[in-house]
Amino acid sequence: MQWETVIGLEIHVQLLTRSKIFSGASVAYGARPNSQACAVDIALPGVLPVLNRQVVEYAIRFGLAINATINSPSIFARKNYFYPDLPKGYQISQLAHPIVEGGHVTIRTGDKEKTIHLTRAHLEEDAGKSTHEGFHDKTGIDLNRAGTGLLEIVSEPEMRSSAEAVAYARVLHSLVRWIGICDGNMQEGSFRCDANVSVRPAGSDVLGTRCEIKNLNSFRFLERAIDYEVARQIDILESGGSIVQQTRLYDADRDETRTMRSKEDAHDYRYFPDPDLLPVVIPQEWIKQIREKLPELPEDRHNRYIRDFSLSAYDANILTAARELADYFEQTVKFLPEQIKLCANWIIGEVSGRLNKEGLEIDQCPVSPEQLAGLLLRITDGTVSGKIAKDVFDSMWQSNDNSADTIIDAKNLRQISDNSEIEKWVNEVLAANQQQVADYRAGKEKAFNSLVGQVMKMSRGKANPVQVNTLLKKHLIE
């Protein structure tokens, strides 16, 4: 039997505020356990929550970015369950009236585009953290994270493979960083994914029983966890068994999912409106002000790069993966507007490759857009070859005060374009390699590349490669 995978994601985005959603306690990462938990966070009797205006603005900003509806009023509800790191015995969340409803994003896998619709995005507080290591037969509770503001983003179950799920998660990860509401640090838990996975016979419209995989904090783990879970469910169904609805954890060391608890439904949490928090009424004028402050969004830039810069969808996709990278590209193009494709190639290749190798972000790049444009200008005007330019780029990276021209002159790297000098090297190479000359004339193209390499070696890489090719072919057909 052929099976179809059905995936929906719930993504928890930690909002980039300085204080918590309902208290003034700090949200700085890495503080001493329980040093950033105030009376509200630890649920002392008599204390009341006060909503942080900034988290509401961030939620509206996200909703506008995905063309969603901003609900007014929006209502907070109590989600009741017991867990040691949940001091109140309930979590303040949203159910019937989330702040953001609907919306969509576009994902790309290979050369295919697909629209993924969102169900909702709602505000809630994070729980604390249970620690089991270092406590013999006990559990340590750290409430520093309790009360941190989260935006939970829930998709429709429209993804059909782990690749689509990862593409969707990457789009949201890029978007929340792009609009400045989250730092996207997955290692610190700022962006966490829960995957709801089920399978059904191909062609069926009936959803299968789903299992939720909790707290996936890397795109690689998200992909591997989904692939394992799909295979597990298919194996059970083809063996005549049935899927039990449950919450599961992904064990990265063993590359498998395992049962955490039976999966609850909304009614199990006994939601009801929080009597300590008024409905949030959002004026249209405030929404308008937030909309006017939004930057050009990644999808709009992606389309503009294809339309105005004639870049491929692949190039545009990479360049708009992060706002800082797109800004770096556009600043480079401003200095070299006639060489847009060359700028794109170098930023995607040399610049991004070096950043990845050294674990740096684009805003830490020691070569500025102006310096990079200066180097690329020397390629286009024939001062240096592409190969030599890579050596110059390496020197610029190591000594960020140096311009391309300074390094080229200091190291005597200017390309030689004097026909008579290049012809002298060509004649010497041809005279010394009669067998390769004969091989080329007999139809062996590889012999030509060898001859080119020897001329470039003789010139210490400084001969103009276009002229070398032209002169070699001229002499070889004589």
From Swiss-Prot:
GO terms for biological process: glutaminyl-tRNAGln biosynthesis via transamidation; translation. PROSITE patterns: GATB. InterPro entries: Asn/Gln-tRNA_amidoTrfase_suB/E, Asn/Gln-tRNA_Trfase_suB/E_cat, Asn/Gln_amidotransferase, Asn/Gln_tRNA_amidoTrase-B-like, GatB, GatB_C_1, GatB_Yqey_C_2, Gln-tRNA_amidoTrfase_suB_CS. SUPFAM superfamilies: GatB/YqeY motif, Glutamine synthetase/guanido kinase. SMART domains: GatB_Yqey (SM00845). It comes from the Bacteria. It is an enzyme of class 6 (ligase). It holds the Pfam family GatB_N. One of its GO terms (molecular function) is glutaminyl-tRNA synthase (glutamine-hydrolyzing) activity. It catalyses: L-glutamyl-tRNA(Gln) + L-glutamine + ATP + H2O = L-glutaminyl-tRNA(Gln) + L-glutamate + ADP + phosphate + H(+); L-aspartyl-tRNA(Asn) + L-glutamine + ATP + H2O = L-asparaginyl-tRNA(Asn) + L-glutamate + ADP + phosphate + 2 H(+). Allows the formation of correctly charged Asn-tRNA(Asn) or Gln-tRNA(Gln) through the transamidation of misacylated Asp-tRNA(Asn) or Glu-tRNA(Gln) in organisms which lack either or both of asparaginyl-tRNA or glutaminyl-tRNA synthetases. The reaction takes place in the presence of glutamine and ATP through an activated phospho-Asp-tRNA(Asn) or phospho-Glu-tRNA(Gln). This is Aspartyl/glutamyl-tRNA(Asn/Gln) amidotransferase subunit B. The gene is gatB.
